């Protein structure tokens, strides 16, 4: 599975979620992780992130299976990831 994170430096929720993103990487080391800056990375646009950041998109075989939008607590985030395992 692949997790794509789209965030921005001006987004407070993105900064808060950055710590949880690092924890995801530690707890799910077999996933592929990609990060894009909403303002700087043109590649982010292919995922159509919308206007609410951060966005974490979970892909399986290059198909989106889950989209997590906005700031989440650690338990909420891990629950959403666990649901697709």
Where are the language model's segments positioned?
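Hydrophobic beta-strand anchors of alpha/beta hydrolase catalytic cores
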Residues: 3-4, 56
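Non-catalytic, surface beta->alpha helical segment in thiol-disulfide oxidoreductase systems
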Residues: 57-85
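Chalcogenol-based redox active-site neighborhoods
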Residues: 19, 47, 74
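Preference for well-ordered, secondary-structure-rich cores of eukaryotic proteins
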Residues: 1-2, 61
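Conserved redox-active cysteine motifs that mediate thiol-disulfide chemistry
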Residues: 6-19
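Structured loop/turn residues at beta-strand edges in well-structured enzyme cores
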Residues: 29, 51, 63
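Thiol-based oxidoreductase modules, predominantly thioredoxin-like and allied folds used
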Residues: 5-6, 21, 25, 29-43
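Structural micro-motif
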Residues: 47-57
């Amino acid at each position: 599975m692949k997790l794509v994170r789209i965030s921005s430096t001006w987004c407070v929720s993105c900064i808060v979620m950055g710590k949880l993103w690092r924890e995801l990487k530690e707890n799910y080391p077999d996933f592929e992780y990609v990060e894009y800056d909403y303002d700087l990375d043109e590649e982010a646009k292919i995922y159509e992130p919308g206007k609410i950041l951060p966005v974490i998109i979970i892909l399986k075989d290059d198909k989106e299976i889950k989209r997590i939008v906005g700031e989440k607590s650690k338990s909420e985030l891990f629950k959403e990831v666990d649901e697709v395992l």
